[in-house]
Amino acid sequence: MEQEYHSEVFDIRRVSENDKELFREVAKAEYLFGRLYDVEPDIGLKVYWESMTEDDTEINYSVFLKNGDLLGRVALQGIDNKFPELAIIIVKQYQGQGYGELLLKEWLNWICTTMGYHRINIRIDSSNTRSIKLFQKLKAIVDREEYIIYCHLDLPME
């Protein structure tokens, strides 16, 4: 299985131990862990990093822009399931600039081609308006709505 994806905009590779300090900005931008990070940055990073790297059913990727800046993280969670779940975090410096939509279109098509997944599940906290807007743009199909919005994307994407 290919471990890296490169395009005109992104360099994406599996997360490595060398990324831990870089992931401070990712932990800060993460919707739930970011709240802990704001109070106790070192503990927030430690908990975030451990939760991300110790789960054998996740594949985590570091996303870099071509200038070398860390853009964020994308992940497949529950890879042992028929339909894995998507996680995406864009660092605050780059939020709201269209990177999330472009990243997901490129990366999810690569995931479809290299891993054979044709559907990705998504859970969004109903108060996370930024994520809701992103997945509306991507035409995510809503399966059910509660305080969590459960939806999915069919792959490949257009």
Question: Can you annotate each of these PLM segments?
Answer:
Residues M1-W49, M157-E158:
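A short, well-structured alpha-helix characteristic of acyl/acetyltransferase catalytic modules
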Residues V15, I90, I124:
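Hydrophobic adenine-recognition pocket in adenosine-nucleotide-binding enzymes
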Residues G34-E85, V91, P156:
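Acetyl-CoA-dependent GNAT
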Residues F83, T113-I124:
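Conserved GNAT acetyl-CoA-binding A-motif
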Residues V91-Q93, Q97, S126-S127:
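Active-site acidic-Proline motif in GNAT/NAT acetyltransferases
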Residues Y94, G98-E106:
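Conserved acetyl-CoA pyrophosphate-binding loop and the N-cap/start of the following alpha-helix
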Residues E101, S126-R144:
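Conserved active-site alpha-helix within GNAT-family acetyltransferase domains
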Residues I141-E158:
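C-terminal "cap" of GNAT-fold acetyltransferases
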